[in-house]
């Protein structure tokens, strides 16, 4: 609109046009006088032409290319007649291109085409005079042109209606012709033809010819569109009526089906036994449902809610198997060892057989991965004759996953607890909450806090799910939780759990588990008969010792499965073979080179001690290296040690310094010596105080320049005065040392009570030496001190005690 308004006002002055101007070739654009147009300029010569124009008289000659594909046009590639334009604005872009706003001034024909010294094309010009006498004939042609253009605008939806108003106000025939031509939706060849007509009257006659042709075409298009529209409307009308009839029939049928569904829900509600509160809530929702249209969104929400309430096992329980002998038999069939777990289940059954009603225990199985925590829970369910459900709590961060979403939310549903109860089909299943030490929390709530109500026997008989909004009794459920470590379990949740610890398996236990459970199961899964797959004496022990290094039996299961696959392949390739025997000498053929070497190097070394650590994946041995060098009495600690372990190292160094006279260490050495303590496997975080005596021993060894016996491992916290304090996880640490070929273990005397948990077959092969002071540790690992005459040994195992 603003552009056309500008066209309608004549300029008071015409800029003086020189004989030579910079040439700006454009693509796919025909520019007429009095026409304002934005241009994007990117070619080098065109950019230089514009810059030259802006630095002189702001005039440039714009002509259209015949072929838009040509990058560097020659005289034969452009039309002879173009438009002299004034550059109104120019803007440099960050990518080096230009944006310009130009206005056409006059038609002209180029006469000379050459490259200037500044790198742009310049042309000589012949400017045309377009003055026309005011005659009645010219006025008639102008009126006819305006009338045809108004008709054209009405037929062409791509041109705004208000254009015709602006055009009707133009009095100059040349200006009128150019304005109408610029708005015609025609080919560029036709637009160029109009541009080349210098006489305004001839130009208007050409435009009248084009408008008549275009109007005829537009009328034909409109008739075709009307005919097609009428046909479509007829088809759509028939389709609409057909669909409406189908909808009416479907509605009548749906009403029958909806009524049938409603009757089914009513009948189910009458038959289902549930607490009075749940019954009242269901009746209330049923009354609301009866008053609603069957297909309304709210009706669907209520129907889903009622289905959830009616499907829950409110008073449906399985009958417990109270035969203790049968229960023990089932537990022994599925698992080797794990006596504490089995005893706890049998105790529960024994009490249940007397009192009939007992609150379900909340057990927590703590132990390394792969030791049977989840699988024993399944066996517990089987021994009790109960249904079994399991949900994994690892990574759960939303409280709504426990308590459910309120019904105000779209797509809401009960939490995992109620969902699992429905899945179990009884209100007294064995319910395992796996990996509760890996529960997260964020802005959506704290799931561990939501579990407090679930796992508290004093509260869970009125567990309220947000979706149901009625209490459900969970007191009959036997909850079993599992975790690898207690560190990440909140104190309030931990207080509600009855702990049962699972320890690492010994090699003997692993062999029994493999022979009785893993091998038969893998043979069945791989389609092998027992006579086709034979383990020779000692082969299974080598697999356990040299191909696995774990607390549980998961890797052992994988290695046995690997052997089964190799045996199946061998039997299938060689049909004559009846069986394959796995022997110690051919294990490398099937499993490759042994991954682990149990026997440690027997060479003693200065400043290298073996500590023992307990992690969530079981016990581990910990090599501690200490070196000294000239310096200023500083202690460097590396190996990704935690704050507690760093403080333990500092305490150990203080003890060694304070005992320098007793240990025969030069006291002056500490003032000019730096100590570097390193624990290998630097990428693995390490923390805890139980490496204190190992750190002190390694530091003393370096200061005394005497080696430490390599077959000794030790664990215990050390004080500044050398006392050895108790630690946790002794069984796991001892089993780890046993796996690594350690023969002597020093442990705090206050931990002697924990020896009863260590298997007899392990104790018999180890020297377990309780210590209460660092003097005893150093005398056993480096050399005996004359003043220390009472070294204590465990007398539990005859000749193995010292």
Swiss-Prot record:
PANTHER family: ATP DEPENDENT LON PROTEASE FAMILY MEMBER. ATP-dependent serine protease that mediates the selective degradation of mutant and abnormal proteins as well as certain short-lived regulatory proteins. Required for cellular homeostasis and for survival from DNA damage and developmental changes induced by stress. Degrades polypeptides processively to yield small peptide fragments that are 5 to 10 amino acids long. Binds to DNA in a double-stranded, site-specific manner. Its main location: cytoplasm. One of its GO terms (cellular component) is cytoplasm. The active site is at residues 690, 733. Keywords: ATP-binding, Cytoplasm, Hydrolase, Nucleotide-binding, Protease, Serine protease, Stress response. Homohexamer. Organized in a ring with a central cavity. Residues 603-784 form the Lon proteolytic domain. GO terms for molecular function: ATP binding; ATP hydrolysis activity; ATP-dependent peptidase activity; sequence-specific DNA binding; serine-type endopeptidase activity. This is Lon protease. GO terms for biological process: cellular response to heat; protein quality control for misfolded or incompletely synthesized proteins. Its EC number is 3.4.21.53. It catalyses: Hydrolysis of proteins in presence of ATP. Induction: By heat shock. It is found in: Cytoplasm. The gene is lon. It is an enzyme of class 3 (hydrolase). Belongs to the peptidase S16 family. ATP binds at residues 367-374. It comes from the Bacteria. Residues 21-215 form the Lon N-terminal domain. InterPro entries: AAA+_ATPase, ATPase_AAA_core, Lon_bac, Lon_bac/euk-typ, Lon_lid, Lon_proteolytic, Lon_Prtase, Lon_prtase_N.
